[in-house]
């Protein structure tokens, strides 16, 4: 099946933010059943929402960090920390977003988010490893 223009635009945005290696690995590990989900995510989240002109990718990345903290999704948050760095969000900005979200979402959600972000930042080599 030929992919739609929305899918292609979304795929490019997704690769730009999350990294081609991560995105391509997800798609390669997808069977026909799960491809329905991949299409929804790629076309609507990335091809539509992430590709709209109203907000830049850095701002969208910052919003995602706060939203994923509020939802209590540290597994996804770690992935989006890498994306935030790719869109120009600094380590200090990530920390401030998580502090602000902790105040409104509660300390359990904040703690999960800080841990996930810390692991992701260590993995990206932008924080020194504790000795």
Specify the residue positions occupied by each region the protein language model found.
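Residues at alpha-helix boundaries and the short loops/turns that link adjacent helices
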Residues: 17-20, 74, 88, 104
């Amino acid at each position: 099946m030929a992919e739609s223009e929305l899918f292609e635009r979304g795929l490019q945005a997704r690769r730009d933010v999350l990294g081609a290696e991560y995105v391509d690995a997800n798609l390669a590990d997808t069977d026909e059943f799960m491809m329905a989900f991949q299409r929804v995510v790629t076309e609507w989240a990335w091809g539509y929402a992430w590709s709209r002109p109203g907000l830049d990718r850095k701002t969208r990345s910052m919003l995602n960090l706060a939203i994923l903290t509020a939802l209590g999704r540290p597994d996804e948050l770690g992935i989006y920390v890498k994306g935030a760095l790719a869109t120009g969000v600094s380590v200090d900005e990530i920390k401030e977003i998580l502090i602000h979200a902790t105040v409104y979402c509660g300390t359990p959600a904040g703690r999960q988010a800080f841990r996930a972000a810390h692991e992701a930042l260590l993995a990206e080599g932008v924080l020194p490893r504790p000795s």
